Amino acid sequence: MPQLIEIYRLSQSLFYICSMTELNIIWFRRDLRVHDHAALASACAAGGQIVPLFIFEPNYWQRADTSERQFEFAVESLADLDRALRQRGSQLCLRSGVVTEVLSRLHAQHGIASLHFHSLGNTPAEAEQDRQVRTWALKVGIPLREHTGIQHSISPHSDWDTAWRRHMRKPRIAAPAALPPLSIPSEGWPIASDFGLESDGCPDRQTGGRTNAILQLRWFLSGGGRNAGKANLSITACEATASRLSAHLTMGSVSEREVWQAAMKAQAALVTDGDETFATALHRFTEKLAKRSRRVQASARVSLTDTSLLPVDIHNREEASLADPRLSAWTNGKTGFPLLDASMRCLQATGHLESSLRSLLLSFATCHLWLGPVRPAQVLAQLCTDFAPAMYYVSASQVIGLSKAAPAYIPNPVRQSLSRDPDGAFIRKWIPEIAELPDQYLHAPWEAPKSALSAHGIILGQSYPMPL
């Protein structure tokens, strides 16, 4: 019997040793693709067992500026990535928790040979997480292969545009043709309520994932973007020609370089064909991509001290409580200003709104209603499917008047309404209560005579609010 016990112990020890498989971890973050992925290529070059890891972080999803719509878009993007990995013989390994704790458990249970990832480092929390992972890897002696990306590799004092375009022209990294099978178990897919995210009702939200991103890109480059970025377009026309790629770029379902190269190729073909209108539109689009990347880089150099990621409010506006009627009216699209209310209702239902209208909403809350900027910025962030903390708060601080780069943006909502929605199509779509009003009264219904209002069954203050 003692001999049998000893044999059993030896077999268990051998099993444990064999289970220490020395994993090469590819840690996916906001780069949910297998194409043009430097960290994945680095992990593949290391050979051996490869674990495509994604960690759901409670600390992130429990923030005041995240939401169910963002979570669901991320899960859809991850599911598409999982399908791409399975086509190559592997699959996603899902975990939930604090990143360094998850890595520590994996190392204790299986052994980690190397860790490969793209750094973020654009907000204090992201920079701190990157630092903690580096410290942990150094402490336990694990080789780290950190890929910084364009926004960190270019000095703010360099010729940024030239360097960015040089990076964009580099050949894209090919996706691996095959991957070894996942050698460790994955946790199940979490749901939004696991992180305390409440249902926020976004019936017309776009669907995440690389498959949808590529379809959207092809639509845009094959004719959908013919008028993209053109001056003096109405809101409805802008919506019809928008690329709708921002959320996909945020999650990294497609790389910025992949989109830029596809747009440049299409632009060159259009120039050859003599289609200057469309070629010019794609030029504007690539310039917008550059501006987006520059904003990401700028965010890494902005001093963000508030927990909301906004600089301290130099105007000392009082932060609104959730019960504040002004905040409630603004959040629910009931300010009495039709363009503002239509914009908010559109964002509520779709998760998408062009940037100038987002700025209009935030400016009205903080500069007209004089609400403290933190809560309005958080509410607006929750509604945006393409929310990326670093870029969002850099832009928000400029709109609100907290940036040294520019004064606050304070547009007149009625004047904006007349110029951006002259035929009232956008307002009528989202505010059916006043859809029957003639164009001359639609943008400022409080100026309409009572006879015009009553003729269409409108009672200001009841069927539609008086302006705040």
Please give the residue ranges for each predicted region.
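Short, positively charged and aromatic/hydrophobic N-terminal segments
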Residues: 9, 15-16
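C-terminal catalytic domain of photolyase/cryptochrome flavoproteins
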Residues: 38, 204-205, 211, 230-468
